[in-house]
């Protein structure tokens, strides 16, 4: 199982999901769901998370989290670990509850968080578990729409602020917005299965990731062009572009060109004064 996403920085926004092992239920009854939300409340307070939306299904959950500190991986490890232990004690079982680790997509807040908030609370409607989002008790919809008090872990101010300053009017507009959302999917700009955002957002993330050695190279450069396309008919400048701009290693370039990596290194040094690399 691949390591989960390790792109962590203050202000990062994530769509997080985790599924039951072998598609088994991770929530068998209401006490399980309350236990999970209580655990989540403790974790988000400890690690400085803001929750904009959530939905608990039967064999998986969705969370939309904004981190004030770079703590996603530590917090998720605690959330799933503590809940698994409590679930196993309660149901007198042993073994894994979740299918591997969680999955997280880092999200461009301004462009995609609003649509994702709608997508998450419509999940029960899409799978025909209920007819409307308001009929599902275990999501953030009812609290955001003003139908029930908001739990302490849910931050609704940003979301409702997208619909106006007057609270009741914003809630009414939010209800209309969700009602009109069936059939819409927010994943058109998903890149590499772990990024949702524009090219400018990707460029900013790439700059951040260059400073994070723990991020796998394939995640640092999710939208880079193929090596053969970079090197085609570009000579030494192509080598410089592949190495400096797109993060290909000397060994990768050498293997592609079928030369020794020392040859690639020597050709690369010739381009050190090239300004457009």
PLM regions with names:
Residues 1-57, 66-277:
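Short Pro-Cys-Gly-centered "Cys-loop" motif that presents a nucleophilic cysteine in a tight turn
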């Amino acid at each position: 199982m691949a390591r989960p996403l390790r792109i962590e920085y203050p202000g990062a926004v994530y769509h997080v999901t985790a599924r039951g092992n072998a598609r088994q239920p991770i929530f068998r009854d209401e006490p399980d769901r309350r236990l999970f939300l209580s655990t989540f409340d403790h974790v988000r307070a400890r690690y400085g998370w803001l929750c904009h939306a959530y939905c608990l299904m039967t064999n998986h959950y969705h969370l939309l989290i904004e981190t004030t500190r770079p703590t996603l991986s530590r917090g998720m490890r605690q959330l799933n670990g503590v809940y698994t232990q409590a679930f196993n004690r309660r149901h007198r079982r042993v073994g894994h509850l979740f299918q591997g680790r969680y999955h997280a997509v880092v999200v461009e807040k301004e462009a995609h968080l609003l649509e994702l908030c709608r997508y998450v609370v419509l999940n029960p409607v899409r799978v025909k578990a209920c007819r409307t989002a308001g009929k599902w008790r275990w999501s953030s919809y009812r609290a955001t729409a003003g139908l029930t008090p908001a739990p302490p872990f849910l931050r609704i101010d940003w979301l409702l602020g997208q619909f106006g300053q007057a609270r009741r009017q914003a809630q009414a507009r939010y209800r209309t917005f969700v009602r009109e959302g069936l059939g819409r999917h927010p994943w058109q700009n998903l890149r590499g299965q772990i990024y949702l955002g524009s090219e400018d957002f990707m460029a900013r993330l790439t700059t951040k990731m260059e400073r994070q050695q723990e991020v796998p190279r394939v995640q640092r450069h999710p939208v880079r062009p193929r090596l053969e396309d970079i090197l085609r008919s570009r000579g030494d400048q192509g080598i410089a572009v592949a190495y400096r701009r797109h993060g290909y290693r000397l060994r990768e370039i050498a293997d592609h060109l079928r030369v020794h990596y020392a040859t690639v290194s020597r050709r690369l040094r010739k381009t050190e004064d090239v300004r457009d690399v």
